[in-house]
Amino acid sequence: MKILIVTDAWYPQVNGVVRTLDETSKQLKKFGHEVKLITPEGFLTIPCPTYPEIKLSLFPGAKVSSMIRDFNPDCLHISTEGPLGLAARGYASRNGLAFTSAYHTRFPEYVYARTKLPLKITYSFLRWFHNRSELVMVPTEEVKKDLIKYKLGILKYGQEV
């Protein structure tokens, strides 16, 4: 199976999201799948203002669309809601492609702590982003309950391969 994973979180960041995606791609390859990752590498980026280790891709739409089209995946997984994730979601929506997504961290709380943007606004964005997904993978029961509370649709745990 050809599996495409799109993520805004990648090396040189060192965090749980990056480690999880790196290990997931390795395990999928061990099972014989062809795995490609779309990461900020190869895109024009700027550092995230409140977290400079995060590289935000600038204007990734056309390149992401081309990469998805060229790879022609059997499975599209969008792991983050940043510029690359948004570009992949847009391509999938415009072209009728199903995709799965993931919610890794308490993003709205993180945004609120740094900007005081009300949680309701960030959760509204997440609801819009993930409700088009066939399946939203979450790391824990606690995170699942949080997202259900904010009406983010049907969720399923990520599972170790």
Question: Each predicted region: which residue ranges?
Answer:
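Nucleotide-sugar donor phosphate/pyrophosphate-binding loop at the beta->alpha transition
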Residues: 98-100, 107-128
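Short, well-ordered alpha-helical microsegments
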Residues: 84-87, 144
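Short N-terminal targeting/anchoring amphipathic segment
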Residues: 64-85, 95-100
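Glycine-rich, highly charged phosphate/nucleotide-binding loops
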Residues: 50-67
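Donor nucleotide-sugar binding/catalytic pocket of nucleotide-sugar-dependent glycosyltransferases
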Residues: 124-161
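N-terminal subdomain of nucleotide-sugar transferases
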Residues: 1-43, 71
